[in-house]
Amino acid sequence: MTQAVMLQGTASDVGKSVLAAGLCRIFYQDGLRTAPFKSQNMALNSGITPDGKEMGRAQIFQAEAAGITPDVRMNPVLLKPTSDRQAQVVLMGKVATNMDAVSYHDYKPRLREQILAVYNSLAQEYDVIVLEGAGSPAEINLRDRDIVNMGMAEMAQCPVILVADIDRGGVFAAIYGTLALLHKQERDRVKGVIINKFRGDVALLYSGIEQIESLTGVPVLGVMPWLDVDLEDEDGVALQNDKYRGNAPRDITIAIVQLPHISNFTDFNALAAQPDVRIRYIRRPEALTDVDLVILPGSKNTLSDLAWLRESGMADAVLQTHRQGVPVMGICGGYQMLGDTIVDEVESGLGTQPGLGLLNTITRFAQDKTTTQVNATMSDELPGWLAAAAGLPVRGYEIHMGETVLQEGCCTAMTLQKNGCSVADGAVTADGLAFGTYLHGLFDSDAFTRAVVNGLRARKGLAPWETTFCYAEHKARQFDLLAEAMRQHIDIDKIYTIMQQYQEPV
């Protein structure tokens, strides 16, 4: 019989996704067939399964931690915000519709049956399911139609472990308050607490732990220290908290423009892991100094973010940096923004708008979304800092709703292999100072990444870094380090006992 455990949090960004990945790794190491599951994920970081389905990046890296291929059943509902009030609803990997928050709240009960069926089908194939909640189960205004926290735990008939973040302060109030706001049957489902992101001497917590256990009747299963592991984040909260503003001195500095609707910033994890690269996320024009490459990332609302670039002064800063000879790269929405013209009657309804004009391209938005994994080959001749990447194989995935056509003065950057056909992708100028592509995950291709970083090194008169950094091995090491730390600081035997002896609350 399949066993299951669910991690819920006292708030967003308390570390549920990472700890769920750690449990997946531990169970995998212990020889159990393990799968992650999150019924509903709200994030702009998404990826594509081998069969072309879109799902949240968190469940993708949790699946990787479990040693299995990502499956869209692990995240049947994905919400991708397009504005402060609306989100694109992706069901079982395909776009269903756009909804505002009120409409979606009314719609959720219709999803319960489908979510339960998907969960049950997944559970039939694995020994353990590690479920993850969203935000907090104490959102009492949403409880009556909940499908992701206690509502999901009820459907799965599984125990819950509550995760609390001590780094933000008020951890005991967060634990007590969360449990106090739950119904009795829901509280009875919570079998343990993990205090996460602790810095300092854990002995200082002992008296507080004793008191919170006495007040709530729920044992604290462990105190996880703040870990220096390099793992993906589920959403933009990490960016808002300045997690990625690197300060370590490195030979190469790459600026990522932090768009308001930035998507798939996990594209840059492999870059950030390079031993000679420093990544800086930039929100203000005055911060765009002393950089070797500027990247415009993906966006869930291209024209809105393009307008922000102009209004904030970032567009002028990017163009000025480009005039000074610094290369500018765009990925997906960022690629579209680098062009001359964007025609959008779909995403924003704003019609024809001028781009930044660094690439002579025209982009037209379409109703249908392209979602596919692809293999590609970089063009045989590439200029400037990209020259060493010429002819290299790369792999990635597409998630976009537009088609970009190259005009005079632009060359194709790469050739994709799709459905047995060769398809041109991307654009690069003759001097190599503007380069764009639709391909997400490009920097996960180790040889390509080392080639372009060495191209940037050459521009500064630095010798190439001869050793190619293997990002897949790096991720595997991070999963193992996480699992090792969790075994050291959390009572994993107790979690096994909780799963094995769990009985549904009456």
From Swiss-Prot:
Active site: C332, H440
Highest taxon of source: Bacteria
InterPro entries linked to this entry: Class_I_gatase-like, CobQ/CobB/MinD/ParA_Nub-bd_dom, CobQ_GATase1, CobQ_N, CobQ_synth, GATase_3, P-loop_NTPase
Keywords: Cobalamin biosynthesis, Glutamine amidotransferase
Gene field: cobQ
Family: Belongs to the CobB/CobQ family. CobQ subfamily.
MF terms (GO), sorted A to Z: ABC-type vitamin B12 transporter activity; catalytic activity
Any Pfam family the entry gives: GATase_3
NCBIfam families per the UniProt record, alphabetical: cobQ, PRK00784.1
Annotated disulfide bonds: none
GO biological process, one term: cobalamin biosynthetic process
Pathway: Cofactor biosynthesis; adenosylcobalamin biosynthesis
Name of the featured protein: Cobyric acid synthase
Function: Catalyzes amidations at positions B, D, E, and G on adenosylcobyrinic A,C-diamide. NH(2) groups are provided by glutamine, and one molecule of ATP is hydrogenolyzed for each amidation.
GATase cobBQ-type domain span: 251-448
